[in-house]
């Protein structure tokens, strides 16, 4: 959805409908069930239309699940893929070391979530024939594992957990993530916002990239000011950047809410 702001500049917002289990036709049998979601997007667009530009600099922020997810995938997940570790990623010399506060546990789920439900992208066996199982990557802030193929698992003396997949049948299997997430904590969103005097609550992203040093840059499509512990005005598009393991070592609150996002695509050379 697009609208013109009072200054004549266009503002845009979008969201992904569907995703998760099933195929496209499973999610779009009745368009009416998305009317409420579309109304919400229009309301957000009108807020963004009146939004303000962010101030540059270091800020305390709250990251919604969409931002936490892209951080887990792009800025952390790729650095602990063992082929990239062999290529010199930041994780190469950090195994067994603290890379985050003890609030952070990050897992790459194979096919079944802790509550017994099916993961958004269930993988039961990978393209090397390895039975898939969960891989704990960060445990209470300590980097404890890599995602492996059979070859890299032998190199590192680890067990493969089914992370080798090819984009198509003719592609060589590469080490890939499956259902990667930072596990929820115990804090409430309202308490997290109340703890910030001057910062931002970022809710939606429109792009992101990172390199093997963990340095990242994410586009922010929707968010709000936080002033004196309360949400303020909506903001216009902006960009955040940082270094993942440095950021994770500043986390002091973690929401008890968890939302899966199925909107991303990841090529990794294929």
Specify the residue positions occupied by each region the protein language model found.
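N-terminal small-residue-enriched
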Residues: 1-270
């Amino acid at each position: 959805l697009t609208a013109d702001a009072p200054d004549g500049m266009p503002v845009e917002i979008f969201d992904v409908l569907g995703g998760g289990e099933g195929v496209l036709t499973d999610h779009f049998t009745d368009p009416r069930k998305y009317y409420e979601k579309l109304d919400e997007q229009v309301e957000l667009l009108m807020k963004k239309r009146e939004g303000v530009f962010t101030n540059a600099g270091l800020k305390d922020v709250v990251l919604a699940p969409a931002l936490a997810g892209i951080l887990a995938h792009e800025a952390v997940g790729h650095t602990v893929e063992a082929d990239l570790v062999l290529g010199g990623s930041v994780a190469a010399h950090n195994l067994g070391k603290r890379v985050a506060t003890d609030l952070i546990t990050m897992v790459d789920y194979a096919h079944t979530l802790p509550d017994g439900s099916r993961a958004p992208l269930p993988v039961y066996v990978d393209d090397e024939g390895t039975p898939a199982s969960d891989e704990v990557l960060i445990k209470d802030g300590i980097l404890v594992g890599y995602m492996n193929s059979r070859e890299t698992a032998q190199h590192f003396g680890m067990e493969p957990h089914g992370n080798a997949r090819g984009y198509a049948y003719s592609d060589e299997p590469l080490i890939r993530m499956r259902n990667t997430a930072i596990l929820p904590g115990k804090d409430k969103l309202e308490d997290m916002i109340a703890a910030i005097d001057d910062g931002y609550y970022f809710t939606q992203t429109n792009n992101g990239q990172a390199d093997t040093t963990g340095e990242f840059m994410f586009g922010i499509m929707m968010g709000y000011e936080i002033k004196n512990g309360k949400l303020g005005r909506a903001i216009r598009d902006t960009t955040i950047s940082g270094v993942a393991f440095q950021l994770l070592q500043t986390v002091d609150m973690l929401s008890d809410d968890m939302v899966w996002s199925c909107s991303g695509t990841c090529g990794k050379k294929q």
